[in-house]
Amino acid sequence: MVNLKCPICGGEITVEDDALPGELVEHECGAQLEVVKQNGKLSLRLAEQIGEDWGE
């Protein structure tokens, strides 16, 4: 298990060691976060909110 910090509220989040980049986790503050790997280390960033595309 790896302890990471929420980029929104600074709270601690425990993520599995085998978490993959792109995996989504939700923090108790309500933020939807994406696991990213930079320089061999896991970190979190705010997940992009993709809306529905109706072809307009």
UniProtKB/Swiss-Prot annotation:
Keywords noted in UniProt: Amino-acid biosynthesis, Arginine biosynthesis, Isopeptide bond, Lysine biosynthesis, Metal-binding, Zinc, Zinc-finger
Q: Which residues carry this modification: 5-glutamyl N2-lysine?
A: E56
Keyword set includes NAD: no
Q: What is known about its subunit structure?
A: Monomer.
**Which GO MF terms are attached to this record?**
zinc ion binding
Pathway assigned to this chain's UniProt record: Amino-acid biosynthesis; L-lysine biosynthesis via AAA pathway; Amino-acid biosynthesis; L-arginine biosynthesis
- Name positions with the PTM 5-glutamyl N2-ornithine: E56
Q: Which Pfam families match?
A: Zn_ribbon_LysW
Q: Where is the signal peptide?
A: none
Renumbered to this chain, motif EDWGE spans: 50
5-glutamyl 2-aminoadipic acid carried by residues: E56
Any single biological process term in GO: L-arginine biosynthetic process
Annotated residues for binding of Zn(2+) = C6, C9, H27, C29
Q: Which domain of life is it from?
A: Archaea
Species source reads Saccharolobus solfataricus (strain ATCC 35092 / DSM 1617 / JCM 11322 / P2)
Please state what the protein is called.
Alpha-aminoadipate/glutamate carrier protein LysW
Q: What does this protein do?
A: Carrier protein that bears the covalently bound substrates for arginine and lysine biosynthesis; bound L-glutamate is sequentially converted to L-ornithine, while bound alpha-aminoadipate (AAA) is sequentially converted to L-lysine.
